Amino acid sequence: MAHTKAGGSTRNGRDSRGQRLGIKLGDGQFCTAGSIIFRQRGTKIFPGVNAGRGNDDTIYALITGYVKFERRRNRVYASVYPTRVQNSTSAE
């Protein structure tokens, strides 16, 4: 009899998509109120001036303006200013 034996089953074969975390708006970019600036798990970047932090630690803009990343006290802060800020201490 020319039968093929039953093939074994596998427990592999799935791959979840990435969570799409990271920076969404760069330093100096224009944003509107409510725009997501940085998606993260934990507080890698902290909310600065005119920026808020969501339940999932997402940093978002509270006003319409320009994004500015600042380094203060060994932390990186994402702020939003109504006018463009010229500062050499940007950290990204």
UniProtKB/Swiss-Prot annotation:
One of its GO terms (cellular component) is cytosolic large ribosomal subunit. Belongs to the bacterial ribosomal protein bL27 family. It holds the Pfam family Ribosomal_L27. The gene is rpmA. One of its GO terms (molecular function) is structural constituent of ribosome. Residues 1-22 are annotated as: Disordered. GO terms for biological process: translation. Keywords: Ribonucleoprotein, Ribosomal protein. InterPro entries: Ribosomal_bL27 (IPR001684), Ribosomal_bL27_CS (IPR018261). This is Large ribosomal subunit protein bL27. It comes from Mycoplasmopsis agalactiae (strain NCTC 10123 / CIP 59.7 / PG2).
